[in-house]
Amino acid sequence: MEEELRNIMQLLKRYDELEIQQAIDWEKYNLYSIVHHSTSIEGASLTEIETQLLLDEGLTAKGKPLLHHQMQTDHYNALLFVKNAAKEKTPFTTDLLRQIAARVMRSTGNVHNTINGTFDTSKGDFRLLNVYAGETRFVDFSKVPQLIQQFCSELNTAISQEINKEEALILSFDAHFNLLSIHPFEDGNGRVSRLVMNFIQFYHSLPLCNVFKQDKTDYIKALVDTRKSNNIEIFRRFMLGQYRKMLEAEISKVMNQEKKSSSARGGKPNDKGLTLFF
């Protein structure tokens, strides 16, 4: 994993040299991509172009379920909330976590009446029932509040430390895995966990990591294998692969555009500044 981290740091250096994040509309389309892939993993059927049209112009995709549109608009609003909270160095608390979850589930959450009480997923309430995913049985609902309080306290301490890019990246992956393993909500845990990962990356001014929808099977396998073996290195390696994939794609996109621009100018060097075309 150390070699992979070194490769990632070299890619980050190249990424920064190209000033990719300064490109016109780069951040907007990057956030759209995060929304598209994260919701697609959870079943949303809109294409990437349909996601862009929905978030850019409010246009719905013909023949696609309303639920899938709601998932995407809610996730986008939650991502903007996470961005602002991280940029303001907002302490990571249980209340902040619930606010993120409430935004993710705002349009698709429901009130649940159980023998243990009533909870509302659209309000970011913790589950009051036990949940399973395949062969995995997550922690008893009665333990969720205490575990989340501990999770938030430890994350808040870790995130506010003077740490380097490697440490911040690994922290974001570990938080992603640990929150998903607690599974505090009845629904939306995957999306919320990926947003918490993005919160840490925003906080430390790192490019955001995507989990690509094409790699959903490997993503689930990494989660399962990590739990079975109690070895977080498995999930870290998978996420580093996703991060490398994202960085390489962005760098390649810019380099290809540079080549096209250079050819159009007869091989003359480009002026400083980049424009990305989507």
Feature-to-residue mapping (PLM):
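FIC/Doc superfamily catalytic core
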Residues: 1-278
